[in-house]
Structure formats: structure tokens, C-alpha cells
Amino acid sequence: MKQRIAYIILILCFPFNVWGTDTPNSKQAREMFDKTYQMVFGEQGCSLHYDVNLIGLYKTSGNIWYKGEKSKFIEKRYWAWNDGKTHHMVDTKKKTVTLHHAKSDDKDKYSSNFKFEPENYNYNVESTNEGYLITLKLKHGCKGMKLIKALIDKKTRAPISLKIKVAFFWANINISNFKSGNIDNSTFVFPMNQYKTYTFIDKR
């Protein structure tokens, strides 16, 4: 989970405190969240820097690129490319490259803990000095992350930070250098020539 915690990055104005799926506040919150979510995971692509603090367990930072179903991330030890068909995970310490099908949950045994279905949450938004704070609370009987607090910029709607509760721990993610759009598809192509001396582990 430690090396793949970046994937939980973003799967993600009116100061009322009303929960539900049909209040003016919840509708506004959902619309705002959907816009930010599209800026991150839409076909135009995005790039950002992240700093993750998995409270009491782990800290890491890196850069990540998204474009539709494609992704790439770079940390100190782990690098990964997902071109929509094949997922390559590079361990620079062990000098290995592990291959999985892009959509396979097997590439990350913890991925089920971070499944995100927008319809499984109630939405709430409030205005703060730092930005708009959108809170997503898991509906009763649904599975997924229990609570998500997404802070977004009031003008651009770009993500600023995420606070995610899974089971009994919190993950805090600060986001910087966010850019939406102009992401070339070549970004997600695994540079095979750079890793000829590595051991390849094919789990497809």
C-alpha cells in the first residue's frame, strides 16, 4: 500500500451544514465536486505534485499524471506507467518491473479499500478561508472510503488537499503545481530501453 498510496490521490460555497441527497447544499456540493473530479480525471489530462501523510504509518511525495484511464507517477523509489492496457511498476531499489493488466485489481491488493463510486456518498460544502471544503460521507450500507474531505480553490476549482478516512486511519494529501490539460499520450508510454537490466515480472 505504501508505494501505491498515490493512487488514492484524487479520485476525487455555501456554509450550510445539511446532509442529504436532495438539498440545495448537497446538489451544489456534488456539482462542484464533479467539476474538480473532471479536471483531474477527464480526457484532457492533468499533472500535479502530492505530499502524502498516512497518519502514524507513512509519508511520501511525488508527481503524478492522469489522462482518462492512463496514469503515471514518480516517487523516490517507485515509478509506474499505465497506458490503459498495461501497468508497469518499477522498483528502483530491487531493480524489478512488475506488469499487470491495466484494470486488474491484482496490481494493488489494497485497491479495494480505495474504491470510489460517486453515487455512494452524501455531499456537503462549506466556505472556509482556505477554499471550499466539500465533505463526502459514505452512505449507510455502502462500501468504500468512510469520509472524504476535499478542499478546492474558490476561483479555479482546482484541488488543494484531500483528507481521507479508511477503516481507522486517515490519509492527508496536499496537492500543488496542479495543471489541467495539454498532457501528451507519450507521457504514459513505458520507456523500455531505460530498464533493460531490470528483472521483469509478468503477472498478466
Question: For each predicted feature, which ranges?
Answer:
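Short, solvent-exposed coil/turn segments at beta-strand boundaries
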Residues: 42, 64-72, 81-86, 128-129, ...
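Short beta-strand segments that buttress and anchor functional surface loops
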Residues: 49-53, 71-76, 133-141, 161-165
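An acidic-aromatic
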Residues: 63-108, 166, 171
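Surface-exposed, polar helix/loop patches in the mature regions of secreted/periplasmic/lumenal proteins
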Residues: 89-144
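Sec-dependent signal peptide recognition
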Residues: 2-10
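N-terminal leader/targeting segments and the immediate start of mature chains
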Residues: 12, 16-58, 65, 69, ...
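Non-transmembrane domains of secretory- and envelope-associated proteins
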Residues: 21-26, 128-130, 140-147, 155-204
